[in-house]
Design a protein with these regions (language model features):
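Feature marking well-ordered beta-strand scaffolds used for ligand recognition
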Residues: 1-365
Length: 365
């Protein structure tokens, strides 16, 4: 099973797409940073013909590659890009009551290298990974948006364990189920936090394994399972293998590994391995038995995880462009998928083919 391409745009020649989210007829896309572009806004009321309505660059030396939208507000990160000598660090807030024409209304001015990936589904508090001054790498923070014109830091948490030589303990982002946050923490893997009080997070437990770069930790609501990606961060042949695991949160153990895509992807240039998952946000497609994974040069993969011990791939799509690096995705409630490429490929809109569409409908939460 697969998908058909509904439309494609190179985002005005700034095809380094990263995180993306839909809000009404607007689609917000962050950019990796190679192009110098920061954020693109598209009118996707006609998915077959997406139209750019706004686009603005990132500050010099900075990438603004993450977006979150809820409560008629858009949040955008500011983070040092690579080893830039001059950059800005912070969190920017836009009013999107007019979704296609965001208006900047607030900013938290940070220090250090800045904010990486934000998670916010509405309400007073957002949370994100960030590198404040005095820290060599990312920790996890909570930010108060009660006054969106003056966001402020409300809490921070970091793993209080010695980092072994050759390992990198760095927070990425957390997804919540109830009062538990499942936080990807790089080579420290999966950390569970009690966030009954978001301003006072407490460590519950940690599960680790061989391999690192733990990125996204998606709880499958009501199943006691978390699907975890380890991000591939090395190009080309001979890169370390990175996998997607299913973790039993009650037994605190890995129960299975999603089968990697078949083919010669590992021998191709650029990255081969997992990156992001569709995160089952409210208002989007939601399923506790189908998991969508972006897999860099192996495109988009869909897995059936009804039997957590025996997950299987049920659908795939690889863009025809040269050297694809499929990066992030958003799945609409109707099963339509928006996918970004991190190099030059820009944005794709995909429609599930009939057999796959039937499966998605049957498994929708």
């Amino acid at each position: 099973m697969s998908f058909s391409v509904v439309s494609h745009t190179d985002l005005n020649g700034c095809g380094d797409g990263m995180q993306l989210l839909r809000h009404g007829d607007a689609l917000y896309v962050g950019h990796y940073g190679e192009s110098g572009m920061g954020t693109t806004v598209l009118d996707v009321s006609r998915p077959e013909r997406p139209k750019i309505t706004a686009q603005w660059p990132a500050p010099a030396g900075t990438h603004t590659h993450k977006v979150q939208v809820a409560d008629n507000l858009l949040l955008v990160n500011e983070e040092r890009f690579r080893q830039a000598g001059d950059w800005v660090a912070g969190l920017v807030v836009y009013d999107v009551r007019e979704p296609l024409a965001p208006q900047r209304i607030g900013r938290l001015a940070g220090d250090g290298d800045g904010v990486h990936r934000i998670v916010w589904t509405g309400g007073r508090y957002a949370h994100a990974s960030f590198t404040p001054a005095g820290h060599a790498d990312r920790i996890w923070g909570v930010f108060d948006l009660s006054d969106p014109t003056q966001p402020r830091e409300a809490a921070r948490w970091e793993l209080d364990e010695e980092q072994p030589p050759g390992r990198r303990y760095a927070a990425h982002h957390a997804l919540l189920e109830g009062t538990t946050a499942y936080l990807g923490y790089g080579d420290a893997n999966l950390v569970a936090l009690d966030v009954g009080d978001l301003t006072a997070p407490k460590k519950l437990w940690r599960v680790s394994w061989d391999g690192g770069g733990t990125h996204t930790c998606l709880p499958l609501e009501g199943r006691g399972l978390v699907v975890v990606t380890d991000e591939q961060m090395t190009d080309g042949p001979h890169a370390p293998e990175r996998l997607v695991r299913i973790v039993d949160v009650h037994g605190r153990r890995v129960v299975s590994v999603l089968p990697p895509p078949r083919g010669d992807f590992a021998e191709l240039p650029a990255r081969f391995g997992p990156h992001n998952l569709h995160e089952n946000r409210a208002g989007s497609y939601r399923s506790t038995s189908l998991v969508f994974v972006t897999y860099f040069n192996a495109g988009l993969r869909v897995y059936d995880v009804r039997d957590a011990a025996r997950p299987e791939e049920v659908a795939s799509w690889v863009p025809e462009q040269e050297g694809p690096q499929t990066n992030d995705l958003y799945v609409e409630e109707n099963g339509r998928v928006w996918v970004t490429d991190r190099f030059t490929g820009g944005l794709y809109c995909l429609e599930p083919e009939p057999e796959l569409a039937d499966l998605l409908a049957a498994r929708q939460q």
